[in-house]
Amino acid sequence: MINANDQVLKSINFFPEQIKDSLKESLKVNLPKEYQQIKSIVACGMGGSRFPHYIIKELFKEEIKVPYLINDDYNLPGFVDTNTLVILSSYSGTTEEVLIAGQKAYEKKAKIIGISIGGKLKEFINKINAPGYFFNPIYNPSGQPRIGFGYLIGGILGILLNLEVLNYQTEEIIFAINNIEIKKIESEAKLMAKKILNKYPYYIVSEFLTGIGNAIANQTNETAKSISSFRIIPELNHHLMEGLKNPQELKKIAIFIFFFSRLFSSSIQKRFFITQEIVEKNNIETLWYELKGQNKIEQAIGLMAFGNYLTMYLSSLYGENSATVPYVDYFKKKLKEV
C-alpha cells in the first residue's frame, strides 16, 4: 500500500503546483533583447529533463514559431550558431551530456539559457553570464526529476512565452491546470495499474499527446521498474501492425493502452479505432482511456498527472521503491571509474 506520507505521493499530488509555481517564476527571468531574434531552438536534456521538452514541442506544435529540436546526446547539430537558442535542461544540474553540449554551444556562440535547481549547470551559466531559471523544488519532496517534471514544464513554457516564440495566455494555462479533476484521475490510474501488472505496456498516443506517451514510458521504467514502450499513430500504422504476429510468447504479456482524445483530427480518430481492432485480431489485450477536458492543454496536463499516478501505483503493486533508481546510479558510478 502507498503510505499517505510517502514523499513520492506528496510530489505527485503537488504536480499542478509545480507547473503553476515554475510558470510564474520563469516568466520573471530577464532575457537579453537579442534573444528575441532567435531563429531556432535546440533543447538539451536527458530522461526526466528531456521529455518535458518533447511534451511542450508536441502540445504546442502548431503555435511555436521557430524550429524546435530536442538534443539528447553530447553533440550539437551543425546549424547551431548565434541565431540559435540552446536551452540547457538538467534538473539536478549535473547531467554530463548537457554540460558538454553547453560548452559546445558556447563555442558556437549560440544564445544559451539554463533550467535547473543549480549544480554545475548553474556554475556554467554564471561563468558565461547567460540567463537561467533556477528553481527551488519545494513541491517535489521526492527529489526525483521525473516526479518533479512539472517544474520543467512550467519553466520551459515561461521561457517560450517570454521570448514570444509562443503566444498563449498564461491565464488559460492556469485555468486548465486548476480545472483537472485530480482525485478522479488518481482513481482511474490506480485501477489501470492493476490491469497492467505483470504486463508489457505499449502506450499508444498521437498528435498533441505524443510527448506524454514518452513521459509515461520513461516513468514506467524508472518509477515502476518495469519494461514499457510508447508508439505513435499514424507512424505505427506503417509497420508495427505486421509485427504483432510473433513471437507468440509476447502475446501473453503485451497490452496496448490507447490514450484517445476527441480533440484528435478525424483521420487520427479513425486510425485509433482500426488499430485497436487489428491489435485485438492478433489476440493481444488492449485498454482504452479517453481523455476528458475542454481543450488540449487541460487534456495534456490531465494525462501527465495520470501517468504520475499510474506508474507510482504500479511500483507499489510490484513492491518496488518508486523513488530510487539503483541501476542508473550504478551506471553513473561505473562511468566515472572508466
Predicted regions span which residues?
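C-terminal active-site/capping subdomain that shapes the small-molecule cofactor and substrate pocket
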Residues: K245-P326
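Short, small/acidic-rich helices and loops at N termini and domain boundaries
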Residues: N321-V338
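Short, surface-exposed amphipathic charged segments that create phosphate/polyanion-binding patches used
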Residues: L85-V86, R146-G155, M241-P247, I301-F306
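Active-site phosphate/pyrophosphate-binding segments
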Residues: A4-F14, L23-K39, Y139-S142, L161-I253, ...
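Glycine-rich phosphate-binding loops that contact phosphosugars or nucleotide phosphates
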Residues: Y35-I182, K194, F260-E285
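A generic structural motif
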Residues: I70-Y74, S226-H238, E285-Q294
